[in-house]
């Protein structure tokens, strides 16, 4: 059994300070991951099973945001856009096992306001958890006569929106968090 990986990644970020209370930032990320797995399993002396799995991930993202201060209020807000492609195929038969593309916007913001000895904060972020190749596989693995494991090529990514409100007074912190998962 042999596995090889090729990984390429890069990012760029530009900040522009308009004045002492306002900063803008824009940027982009890109990554490419390629993986090749060769499996050879000898089932008995007369036969063997061979597979070569090829996986590719391509992610392109762009983001923009700003930091602003107005009196005692500090705010950060922005947006990120991601395009993500996942390709997983049997390199011997050229059968595509998984070919998925996801495109999504991820907004975020945070506000911070001190009032006397109390620091108040409110924030919202959006995140994604994509299924792995292993979870998306359409093959079955038999561990013994009582145990089998299989993937599900129709799994979808999980998007989570986190909203948090917090109060801090000296060393005492109180927070309320809400999560929406879809």
What would you call each of these model-derived segments?
Residues 1-89, 114, 118-119:
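Face-selective signature of the C-terminal outer-membrane beta-barrel domain
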């Amino acid at each position: 059994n042999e596995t090889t990986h090729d990984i390429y990644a890069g990012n760029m970020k530009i900040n522009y300070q308009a004045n002492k209370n306002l900063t803008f930032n824009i940027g982009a990320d890109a990554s490419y991951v390629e993986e090749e797995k060769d499996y050879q399993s000898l089932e008995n002396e007369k036969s063997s099973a061979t597979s070569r799995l090829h996986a590719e991930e391509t992610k392109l993202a762009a983001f923009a945001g700003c930091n602003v201060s107005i009196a005692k209020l500090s705010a950060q807000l922005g947006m990120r856009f991601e395009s993500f492609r996942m390709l997983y195929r049997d390199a011997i038969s050229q059968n595509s096992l998984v070919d998925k593309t996801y495109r999504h916007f991820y907004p975020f913001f945070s506000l911070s306001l001190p009032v006397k000895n109390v620091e108040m904060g409110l924030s919202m972020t959006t995140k994604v958890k994509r299924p792995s190749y292993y979870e998306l596989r359409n093959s079955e693995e038999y561990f013994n006569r009582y145990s089998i494991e299989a993937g599900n090529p129709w799994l979808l990514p999980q998007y989570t929106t986190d909203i948090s409100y917090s109060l801090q007074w000296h060393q005492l912190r109180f927070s309320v968090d809400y999560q929406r998962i879809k």
